[in-house]
Protein backbone atom coordinates (compact mmCIF):
# COMPACT_ATOMS: atom_id res chain seq x y z
CA UNK A 1 0.00 0.00 0.00
CA UNK A 2 1.30 3.43 -0.91
CA UNK A 3 1.94 6.07 1.70
CA UNK A 4 -0.12 9.23 1.64
CA UNK A 5 1.07 12.70 2.58
CA UNK A 6 -1.57 12.97 5.32
CA UNK A 7 -2.92 10.36 7.67
CA UNK A 8 -6.64 10.41 8.36
CA UNK A 9 -7.73 10.57 11.98
CA UNK A 10 -10.51 8.03 11.36
CA UNK A 11 -9.70 5.63 8.47
CA UNK A 12 -13.13 3.99 8.74
CA UNK A 13 -14.78 7.31 7.83
CA UNK A 14 -12.50 8.22 4.90
CA UNK A 15 -11.65 6.97 1.42
CA UNK A 16 -8.70 7.78 -0.81
CA UNK A 17 -7.61 7.79 -4.43
CA UNK A 18 -4.31 8.45 -6.14
CA UNK A 19 -2.77 8.73 -9.57
CA UNK A 20 0.93 8.39 -10.30
CA UNK A 21 3.03 9.56 -13.26
CA UNK A 22 0.05 11.34 -14.83
CA UNK A 23 0.88 13.28 -18.00
CA UNK A 24 -0.72 16.50 -16.91
CA UNK A 25 0.91 19.82 -16.05
CA UNK A 26 2.09 19.96 -12.45
CA UNK A 27 1.52 23.70 -12.04
CA UNK A 28 -2.01 23.71 -13.45
CA UNK A 29 -2.95 20.62 -11.47
CA UNK A 30 -1.60 22.09 -8.24
CA UNK A 31 -3.76 25.19 -8.65
CA UNK A 32 -6.81 23.06 -9.50
CA UNK A 33 -6.26 20.92 -6.41
CA UNK A 34 -5.88 23.91 -4.10
CA UNK A 35 -9.10 25.41 -5.46
CA UNK A 36 -11.19 22.46 -4.18
CA UNK A 37 -9.27 21.58 -1.02
CA UNK A 38 -11.67 21.38 1.94
CA UNK A 39 -14.81 21.50 -0.24
CA UNK A 40 -17.76 19.13 -0.08
CA UNK A 41 -17.41 16.40 -2.70
CA UNK A 42 -20.61 17.21 -4.59
CA UNK A 43 -19.81 20.93 -4.57
CA UNK A 44 -16.28 20.28 -5.88
CA UNK A 45 -17.56 18.03 -8.69
CA UNK A 46 -20.13 20.63 -9.73
CA UNK A 47 -17.50 23.40 -9.66
CA UNK A 48 -15.08 21.45 -11.86
CA UNK A 49 -17.90 20.79 -14.34
CA UNK A 50 -18.56 24.54 -14.47
CA UNK A 51 -14.85 25.19 -15.06
CA UNK A 52 -14.96 22.92 -18.12
CA UNK A 53 -17.93 24.95 -19.39
CA UNK A 54 -16.00 28.22 -18.73
CA UNK A 55 -18.70 29.41 -16.33
CA UNK A 56 -16.23 29.61 -13.41
CA UNK A 57 -12.44 29.73 -13.31
CA UNK A 58 -9.61 28.19 -11.29
CA UNK A 59 -7.73 30.90 -9.32
CA UNK A 60 -3.97 30.87 -9.92
CA UNK A 61 -2.21 32.02 -6.76
CA UNK A 62 1.31 30.57 -6.86
CA UNK A 63 2.14 29.80 -10.49
CA UNK A 64 0.59 32.94 -11.92
CA UNK A 65 3.30 34.82 -13.79
CA UNK A 66 2.38 35.60 -17.42
CA UNK A 67 -1.24 34.63 -16.82
CA UNK A 68 -4.01 36.81 -18.17
CA UNK A 69 -6.65 38.38 -15.98
CA UNK A 70 -10.31 37.48 -15.92
CA UNK A 71 -13.31 38.80 -14.02
CA UNK A 72 -14.18 35.24 -12.96
CA UNK A 73 -11.29 35.39 -10.49
CA UNK A 74 -13.12 37.96 -8.33
CA UNK A 75 -15.05 35.13 -6.70
CA UNK A 76 -11.78 34.04 -5.02
CA UNK A 77 -10.26 37.48 -4.53
CA UNK A 78 -7.73 37.15 -7.35
CA UNK A 79 -7.42 38.68 -10.79
CA UNK A 80 -5.51 35.86 -12.46
CA UNK A 81 -7.50 32.74 -13.24
CA UNK A 82 -7.69 30.09 -15.96
CA UNK A 83 -9.66 27.06 -17.15
CA UNK A 84 -7.10 24.19 -17.22
CA UNK A 85 -9.29 21.54 -18.88
CA UNK A 86 -6.82 18.64 -18.83
CA UNK A 87 -6.00 19.11 -15.14
CA UNK A 88 -9.69 19.42 -14.29
CA UNK A 89 -10.49 16.15 -16.08
CA UNK A 90 -7.75 14.28 -14.21
CA UNK A 91 -8.90 15.65 -10.84
CA UNK A 92 -12.52 14.85 -11.72
CA UNK A 93 -11.53 11.25 -12.42
CA UNK A 94 -9.81 10.95 -9.05
CA UNK A 95 -12.79 12.50 -7.24
CA UNK A 96 -15.07 9.98 -8.94
CA UNK A 97 -12.71 7.16 -7.94
CA UNK A 98 -12.60 8.34 -4.32
CA UNK A 99 -16.41 8.59 -4.27
CA UNK A 100 -16.67 5.00 -5.53
CA UNK A 101 -14.18 3.86 -2.87
CA UNK A 102 -16.24 5.65 -0.21
CA UNK A 103 -19.42 4.00 -1.48
CA UNK A 104 -17.70 0.60 -1.29
CA UNK A 105 -16.85 1.37 2.36
CA UNK A 106 -20.49 2.27 3.00
CA UNK A 107 -19.95 5.98 3.64
CA UNK A 108 -22.67 8.57 3.07
CA UNK A 109 -21.88 10.41 -0.19
CA UNK A 110 -23.72 13.56 0.88
CA UNK A 111 -21.45 14.04 3.93
CA UNK A 112 -18.12 13.60 2.12
CA UNK A 113 -15.63 16.45 1.80
CA UNK A 114 -12.09 16.72 0.38
CA UNK A 115 -10.00 16.56 3.55
CA UNK A 116 -6.62 16.18 1.80
CA UNK A 117 -5.44 16.74 -1.75
CA UNK A 118 -1.81 16.92 -2.78
CA UNK A 119 0.00 17.22 -6.10
CA UNK A 120 3.66 16.25 -6.38
CA UNK A 121 6.06 16.48 -9.30
CA UNK A 122 6.80 13.22 -11.11
CA UNK A 123 10.09 12.66 -12.99
CA UNK A 124 10.24 14.81 -16.11
CA UNK A 125 9.84 13.14 -19.48
CA UNK A 126 12.65 14.32 -21.71
CA UNK A 127 12.58 14.92 -25.43
CA UNK A 128 14.56 17.21 -27.70
CA UNK A 129 13.78 19.95 -30.16
CA UNK A 130 16.06 20.98 -32.99
CA UNK A 131 16.99 24.65 -33.29
CA UNK A 132 18.72 26.85 -35.78
CA UNK A 133 22.44 26.55 -36.44
CA UNK A 134 22.54 22.89 -35.43
CA UNK A 135 21.66 23.39 -31.80
CA UNK A 136 19.46 21.06 -29.73
CA UNK A 137 17.34 22.14 -26.77
CA UNK A 138 15.54 20.06 -24.20
CA UNK A 139 11.78 19.66 -24.51
CA UNK A 140 10.44 18.35 -21.19
CA UNK A 141 6.99 17.62 -19.83
CA UNK A 142 6.13 18.02 -16.13
CA UNK A 143 3.95 15.07 -15.07
CA UNK A 144 2.27 14.81 -11.66
CA UNK A 145 1.42 12.49 -8.82
CA UNK A 146 -2.00 13.32 -7.34
CA UNK A 147 -3.42 11.95 -4.09
CA UNK A 148 -6.64 12.85 -2.35
CA UNK A 149 -8.62 11.75 0.69
CA UNK A 150 -12.34 12.30 1.17
CA UNK A 151 -13.72 12.11 4.69
CA UNK A 152 -17.22 11.91 6.08
CA UNK A 153 -18.12 14.99 8.10
CA UNK A 154 -18.76 14.35 11.76
CA UNK A 155 -22.00 15.74 13.09
CA UNK A 156 -21.40 18.64 15.40
CA UNK A 157 -22.65 18.09 18.92
CA UNK A 158 -24.32 21.11 20.47
CA UNK A 159 -22.27 22.52 23.30
CA UNK A 160 -24.01 22.53 26.67
CA UNK A 161 -24.95 25.94 27.94
CA UNK A 162 -22.41 27.10 30.47
CA UNK A 163 -23.58 28.31 33.81
CA UNK A 164 -22.19 31.73 34.31
CA UNK A 165 -20.31 31.79 37.57
CA UNK A 166 -20.82 35.09 39.31
CA UNK A 167 -17.94 36.13 41.49
CA UNK A 168 -19.02 38.35 44.36
CA UNK A 169 -16.89 40.53 46.54
CA UNK A 170 -17.15 40.18 50.31
CA UNK A 171 -19.15 43.43 50.45
CA UNK A 172 -21.68 42.07 47.91
CA UNK A 173 -21.98 38.76 49.81
CA UNK A 174 -22.59 40.70 53.03
CA UNK A 175 -25.30 42.83 51.42
CA UNK A 176 -27.10 39.72 50.05
CA UNK A 177 -26.91 38.02 53.47
CA UNK A 178 -28.33 41.16 55.13
CA UNK A 179 -31.22 41.28 52.65
CA UNK A 180 -32.01 37.61 53.36
CA UNK A 181 -32.07 38.30 57.12
CA UNK A 182 -34.42 41.24 56.65
CA UNK A 183 -36.71 39.24 54.35
CA UNK A 184 -36.84 36.27 56.75
Swiss-Prot record:
Q: Does the keyword Ribosomal protein apply?
A: yes
Subcellular location as annotated: Cytoplasm
Keywords in UniProt for this one? Cytoplasm, Isopeptide bond, Phosphoprotein, Ribonucleoprotein, Ribosomal protein, Ubl conjugation
Tagged with keyword GTP-binding: no
Give the chief site where it resides. Answer: cytoplasm
Q: Which GO terms describe its molecular function?
A: structural constituent of ribosome
Note the SUPFAM superfamilies from the entry. Ribosomal protein L22 (SSF54843)
Gene Ontology biological-process annotations: cleavage in ITS2 between 5.8S rRNA and LSU-rRNA of tricistronic rRNA transcript (SSU-rRNA, 5.8S rRNA, LSU-rRNA); cytoplasmic translation
What stretch or stretches form a coiled coil here?
Answer: none
- Anything else known: There are 2 genes for uL22 in yeast.
Describe its function.
Component of the ribosome, a large ribonucleoprotein complex responsible for the synthesis of proteins in the cell. The small ribosomal subunit (SSU) binds messenger RNAs (mRNAs) and translates the encoded message by selecting cognate aminoacyl-transfer RNA (tRNA) molecules. The large subunit (LSU) contains the ribosomal catalytic site termed the peptidyl transferase center (PTC), which catalyzes the formation of peptide bonds, thereby polymerizing the amino acids delivered by tRNAs into a polypeptide chain.
The UniProt entry's sequence similarity note says:
Belongs to the universal ribosomal protein uL22 family.
List the protein's name: Large ribosomal subunit protein uL22A
Its gene name is RPL17A
Amino acid sequence: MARYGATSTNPAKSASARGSYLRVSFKNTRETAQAINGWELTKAQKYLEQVLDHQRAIPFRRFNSSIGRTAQGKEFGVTKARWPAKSVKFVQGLLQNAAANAEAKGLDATKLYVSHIQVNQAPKQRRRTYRAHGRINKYESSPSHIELVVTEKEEAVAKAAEKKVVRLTSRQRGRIAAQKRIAA
